[in-house]
Amino acid sequence: MFFSAFLTRIYLVIVTIFLVAVIAVWFIPRSDISVHAERRPAFDLTAFFDGKTVAYGIFEDRFGNLRRQFRVEIDAKREGNMLTLDERFLYADGEQDRRIWRIEKNIIEGEAVYTGRAEDITGTATGRIAGNTMSWRYEITLELSGMEVEVRFDDFIYQIDKDMAINRAYVSKWGLEIGSVTLVFLKDGLAAQKLPLDLKSW
């Protein structure tokens, strides 16, 4: 009896440790972008996206399986402290989509803070920049398996040079990571080689 109870306790301890480890991985916080403050080139959201941008991306589930691939053409327009990004998407399965971001820059306690809205965004997106890195967080309604599901995006945009930036976005639901997006933005000379982008057929 005593030995059986002892084994039961050991089993419960092992299960608890396993669950804590799994939860820690799923809920692990993303890095504070302040650690990138000295990285160059310094990212300027408005300057980088001004004009036309092309981008290529993939979506992977949390197991690393490729689920979707897509390309995007982005037209940007500046008006004062407001930046409008008109994004047009084409997915490999032929689906087309469009999202228009309206992003405003404000200075709060000496720090630039970005807020953005789009039709399919719940509430307001918020963003900050440190060095070559921008964090951009928002909740969005996506259609998954024929159902509309609200998920959270934690985006990190890293400017590599004047013509290129890489976006890593972590997608979560109820705090659990369900997938990630990798997106490469191309500007100026690199973008010119791809324009006009075919957004009608893959």
Can you annotate each of these PLM segments?
Residues 1-4, 106-108:
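Long, acidic, intrinsically disordered low-complexity segments
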Residues 2-50, 56-65, 190-202:
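Amphipathic/hydrophobic helical signal segments and adjacent flexible N-terminal regions
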Residues 5, 134-137, 141-174:
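A generic hydrophobic-segment detector
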Residues 26-36, 41-46, 69, 86, ...:
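Extended interaction regions within the primary functional domain
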Residues 45-51, 129, 160:
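Edge/loop elements at the starts and ends of beta-strands within beta-rich repeat scaffolds
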Residues 49, 70-72, 151-153:
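Hydrophobic core residues within well-ordered beta-strands of beta-rich domains
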Residues 56-144, 156:
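Central antiparallel beta-sheet cores of small beta-barrel/beta-sandwich binding domains
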Residues 155-202:
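Glycine-rich, aromatic-bearing surface loops/beta-hairpins
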